[in-house]
From Swiss-Prot:
Pfam families linked to this entry: DUF520
UniProt keyword annotations, A-Z: Nucleotide-binding
GO CC entries: cytosol
Family in the record: Belongs to the YajQ family.
Top-rank taxon: Bacteria
GO MF: nucleotide binding
Record's protein name: Nucleotide-binding protein Asuc_2113
InterPro entries noted in UniProt: DUF520, UPF0234-like_C, UPF0234_N, YajQ-like_sf
Amino acid sequence: MPSFDIVSEITMHEVNNAVENANRALSSRYDFRGVEAVIELNEKNETVKVTTESDFQLEQLIEILIGACVKRGIDSTSLDIPAESEHHGKLYSKEIKLKQGIETEIAKKITKLIKDSKLKVQTQIQGEQVRVTGKSRDDLQSVIQLVKGADLGQPFQFNNFRD
């Protein structure tokens, strides 16, 4: 029976390239001349720390980072940006988490969405991915279109397509 997996993954190498591009763009921006501003990637914790001297510049820095991520093919919804910034002395910072894997809550939403569509497929939650199995390829392709069209706040990839 044909099947595929729904996953949510980010290539850390691409995130690293996006952070480097954002830092390069930061060094050439006139409004950041003489300002202490840094974008750092922590690959072990899967976070990006953005630090600068004012709250407004912090938002500008995040926009630069999002632009660099989009250029590298990383969906902006895979960045979990906190609403509040941390304030330490004269510096403001935000710790942006990278969304890897599908949380159980979102996996249940995907399963419910697929079951409500009345397509003849079965879904299984397997850790941080959802396996979809059906009798025909057309049903599986319909599921892919359904999940792509749903706004679940996270980008999804479809891999392991087997006949």
